[in-house]
């Protein structure tokens, strides 16, 4: 449980968010145990997204939560390597191709800035208001996001 749920890495690729100061630390032991029971058939791996997509089999559902797209030229370096606008396009096109070749249902969450990219590829777009607990300018209001969906192709 790091400060406000923030995920950040230094230039060496090491996680560098403080835990914060809490009078009582919440450790969700029961939720973790329930997840472990439900995830017995899940494969959890740490791979580049291209390698992950190469493991997708017919009938698998795919959910992607990439670093959120900003305006071109905006901050993209959440890790020691950044996820650029070109990477966003490459991922969206690869997901569309996977859906067309294998029929897998695809779901992607992203910022409102990615709406046109996914809509132009034929994804069904759902706009949502997502709560924020972190903000660079101190504004912790909700933000517009999208859930982009390609249904299973039979």
Regions found by a protein language model. Name each.
Residues 72, 115-118, 134-137:
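Short active-site-adjacent structural elements
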Residues 46, 88-131:
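Conserved Class I SAM-dependent methyltransferase catalytic core
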Residues 1-76, 90, 100:
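SAM-dependent nucleic-acid methyltransferase catalytic core
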Residues 84-91, 141:
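Short amphipathic alpha-helix initiation/capping segments at coil-to-helix junctions
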Residues 123-154:
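Class I S-adenosyl-L-methionine
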Residues 75-83:
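Short, surface-exposed loop/helix-turn segments at secondary-structure junctions
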Residues 31, 110-114, 152:
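Short, polar loop motifs at secondary-structure junctions
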């Amino acid at each position: 449980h790091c400060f406000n749920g923030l995920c950040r890495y230094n230039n060496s690729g090491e996680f560098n968010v403080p835990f914060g100061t809490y009078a009582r630390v919440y450790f969700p032991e029961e939720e973790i145990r329930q997840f472990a029971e439900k995830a017995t058939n899940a494969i959890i791996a740490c791979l580049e997204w291209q390698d992950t997509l190469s493991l997708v089999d017919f009938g698998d559902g795919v959910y992607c939560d990439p670093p959120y797209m900003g305006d071109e030229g905006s901050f993209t370096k959440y890790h020691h390597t950044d996820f650029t606008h070109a990477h966003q396009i490459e991922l969206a096109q690869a997901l569309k191709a996977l859906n067309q070749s294998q029929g897998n249902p695809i779901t992607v969450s992203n910022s409102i800035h990615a709406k046109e990219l996914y809509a132009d590829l034929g994804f069904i777009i759902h706009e949502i208001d997502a709560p924020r607990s972190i903000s660079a300018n101190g504004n912790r209001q909700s933000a517009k996001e999208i859930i982009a969906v390609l249904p299973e192709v039979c």
